Structures are given as C-alpha cells and as structure tokens.
Amino acid sequence: MVTTTAKNVGYITQIIGPVVDAEFPEGDLPAIYNALLIEGKTDSGLDIRLTCEVQQLLGDKKVRAVSMSTTDGMVRGMKAIDTGAPITVPVGKSTLGRIFNVLGEPIDELGPVEIVDKFSIHRSAPKFTDLVTQPEIFETGIKVIDLLAPYRKGGKIGLFGGAGVGKTVLIQELIHNIAKEHSGVSVFGGVGERTREGNDLYNEFKESNVLGQVALVYGQMNEPPGARMRVGLTALTMAEYFRDVSKQDVLLFIDNIFRFVQAGSEVSALLGRMPSAVGYQPTLGTEMGDLQERITSTNEGSITSVQAVYVPADDLTDPAPATTFAHLDATTVLSRQLASLGIYPAVDPLSSTSTMLQPAVVGEEHYNIARGVQSTLQRYKDLQDIIAILGLDELSPEDKLVVNRARKLQRFLSQPFHVAEIFTGSPGKYVSLDKTIAGFKRVLQGEFDDLPEQAFYLVGDLDEALEKAKKLKDEGKS
C-alpha cells in the first residue's frame, strides 16, 4: 500500500523489464526508496496502476525505479506520482489469518483488512540501548531442539532440509507452541518460492488450526525481482509492530532467504551495478545486514527468526549462504535418513548446532547431558558399518550397551506434534526444558537399559515413556 502525501508528478521516459525511468520537474525529484504510483491506460484501453520504488537518482531530472508488479502494457509518457514516502503496509492484529503481497494488499479474496496503523517497510534497526544483551533460551517445547541446538530469544536460526523431510510441519508446530505457551504470534514471509507451496501451506495452516496466529506475506517465484527483494521487509515490518507496539514475542519465518539475495542480484544487474564474486550484487553484505539487524530482542519483546536456507549446488562457500551463516545463532538440520526411519521431528542431532549450547549460557548440567547424548549417538553412528557387516553379536559388551542406549535416545528424541494429530491420531506434546533435561539424564545414566526401545518412541516426557513401557509389558503378558 502506498500513502500519497506529496503530489510531485512526472512521466515515464523508459521501461526496461521491471526497471522504469521517470522524469520530474526541476527541484521536485523523489527521494531514494520513495514509492511512485504509475497510472495510465494501455494501448488497448486497460487501466494500469502499479507501484515502483526509487532506487537511483540519475541526474538530468530523472530517477530510476524498480516495479513491484509486472510492467506489461506500460508505455512511455504515463503519469508517475511521487507519494512522498516509502511503501507502507498495514500492521496489527487484523493482519493475522490473512495473506498479503509485498504492498500489504490482501490477496486471499477475503475482503479488505481493517487498517489500524501502517508502517514503512524501511525502518532502522533498534538502538543499542534498547537491545537485550543477556542471552536467553527460547523454549520451543520440542525436545531435540531445546536439548541439543537451543534457539536464542531474538536470534536467527537456519533451517536446512530437502523436500518431504518435515520442514513445514516443524514450522507449524513452532507457530502452535509460541501461540499456546508464549502468547506470541508469527509472521511467515514466502520469498521467491513456488506459488503451489504457498497455497499448500495456507491450507495446512487452516487444517491444523494455527492460521489465526499467523500473518502470511507472499512474493512468489513468478513475481518481478522488486517484489521478491522487498517482501522479506514487508513481513519483518509486520513482525516489528507485534514486538514494539504489542510487546509480544514473535516468530518470523523467511522461506527462502537465498531468494532474497537472488532477487537483489537481479535488481542490481538491472540497475547497472558492477557485479562482485559469482555475479552477486556488490551490496550483498549491506542488504543482508539491513534485514538481519532488525531481527533482535529489545526491552519490549523479541523477534526470533527461522530462515530456510537453500544452498546452491550444495556449495557452502557460495557468497549467498556464506553471508547468511555469519548472522545465524543456530542451525536446525533435517535428515532424510531419520525421516525414513520414522523418527519425527527428523532433526539431525549431530549436524544441528547452536551458539547457546555452552555452559555459561545453558548451565553445566544441560551442557554435559547434551554432549553426552551426542557422543553416544556419534559412537552408534561409528559402529553402524561394523554392525552392517558382522552383526550386533560381534560387538563387545561395552559397545552393545552403547548401541542399546543410543537407540533409546534416538527414539526419545522423537515427539508427537499437536499439528500432526489429525494424521497420527496421537495427541501432541509440549515438553518443558526442565523435563527434557531430567529425562535424558536418567536415560543416559542407564537407569532404563532394561526397558524396550519402543517405549521411548513418539512420547513426550519420561513419565509417558515409563507408562508406555508398562503398557507394552502388560500386553506381552496377555
């Protein structure tokens, strides 16, 4: 949405794809990032009304802008109105449960949105004096994350995983848990991904009853680079309102952060900037920093961001993922191997990392238990080749014990999700961090070496596992 406060009127002089040049009267040039409203009729008589964002002042009374929608049908000489302000989008509770485009216009065919307030998508990062510097764990209620790769409140998390390993379900569960346990809300920014995926996500949110706690902002693959480059800022702006005005904890999902960089690269080339390494824009670090620095904890609330990261050609040294990694506090890696074993969430306990997992932050007990779980699982992984060739019987008694315990730990890291109840028939579980630590401590110490590993599969806390073991024993007797 654009707010027209000034009425400097110019006209279009050149159109090259999504890039538009406009000429304005002397002394009335629009500022960088101002929104221009383009109005006119096509040769066939159709009305055109679209928004562009000023990117360059060319001199000679001309500006260069990038369009937020397709420029099909545009002709030279059309009117360009300077709105006098950057793109502004609606913010507040009325955005929850709705889908918006980059301009903050609803695209879900559910009618207009009640606009209480509007924010500019270009905002400064919070002041240093307003930031919370004490690291604090953001409890998700998901055992494997809270124990082995905990999220930082106001931090940035990279979500890595291929198709069909459970990214969407994990995102839905996080949205459910922040709403139910933290009275928080979520904003989902679909940046340059498939329209079909955006549609599927909306329907899945609807089915799992989390749609009312999330605002969706889409700038999909088929849209011009201007829209894909700015849709992340639109989603972030909506999240900032909930943090700064509503004083809530917010989860911001960006899928996919690589597409944000890719769109910036396209725009940079169209604007005639000299490319840098691998053809990326020379301003890559600055653009990424401008977005990421706004995602943080303040004295009012927090924005915790989960960002799906596509790694081109699996090359982690590519400038796009490499620049992203510099900002991440944690990584959650989803494993196809675990998914094929039926262990959900399929979070890889050995590949997922977090800067929070250190004794000074989580405490000695949590740290030692997490490292104990990881070393047991690593030893099991090392032994798998031997088991495949020689079988379990050829292992030493110590190694047999490690394998037995590791298989229990692996299954105990699985958990039924609230949002998957309709598929699994099992009620979802939110497990507090204290219960998670206490449960894994006892399993690691070998207290339950005599229990069947099946008792630990898809349960919440340890009490539930013991109850399941008793049930299995009773069934075995009968």
UniProtKB/Swiss-Prot annotation:
It holds the Pfam family ATP-synt_ab_N. Disulfide bonds: none annotated. It is a peripheral membrane protein. GO terms for molecular function: ATP binding; ATP hydrolysis activity; proton-transporting ATP synthase activity, rotational mechanism. The keyword Translocase applies. Transmembrane segments: none annotated. Its EC number is 7.1.2.2. Produces ATP from ADP in the presence of a proton gradient across the membrane. The catalytic sites are hosted primarily by the beta subunits. This is ATP synthase subunit beta. The lineage of its organism: Bacteria, Bacillati, Cyanobacteriota, Cyanophyceae, Gloeobacterales.
